[in-house]
């Protein structure tokens, strides 16, 4: 697996198999949002050192007040497992469950295509025929 820096996105991943998306939806308790964001910020430098980590972004829902989505990409399941088992991350998970989160949902998915307006290699054939 090689990473190649691009201007359109942080990383375009050349891969033999699909990368993994981790979609973490969290509803912090009303007075715990900042605590969650601070905790996530302390974990980020550790996450960035995980072999196979690609990127992470956080979004706040426009339609569901209080809901935050964290979208992470990893090279493979081994990278996800490495992150999941970092002891400081495990302690943060426990803290989230006991004091920060009202609820959360975690989805882990394989990325089946990865293309952009300018990098069309994995675009479906019909889309390539129509838009190049």
Model-derived regions: residue spans:
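Short S/T/G/P-rich N-terminal loop/turn motif that feeds into the first structured element of a domain
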Residues: 1-68, 77-85, 101-132
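Conserved short loop/helix modules at catalytic or binding sites
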Residues: 92, 96
């Amino acid at each position: 697996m090689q990473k190649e820096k691009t201007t359109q996105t942080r990383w375009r991943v050349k891969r033999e198999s699909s990368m993994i998306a981790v979609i973490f939806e969290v509803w912090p308790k009303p007075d715990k949002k900042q605590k969650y964001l601070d905790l996530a910020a302390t974990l980020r430098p550790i996450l960035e050192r995980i072999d196979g980590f690609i990127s992470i972004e956080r979004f706040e829902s426009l339609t569901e007040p209080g809901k935050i989505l964290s979208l992470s990409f990893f090279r493979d399941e081994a990278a996800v497992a490495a992150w999941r088992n970092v002891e400081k991350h495990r302690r943060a998970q426990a803290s989230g469950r006991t004091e920060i989160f009202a609820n959360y949902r975690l989805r882990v998915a394989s990325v089946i295509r990865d293309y952009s307006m300018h990098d069309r290699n994995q675009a479906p054939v019909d889309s390539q025929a129509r838009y190049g």
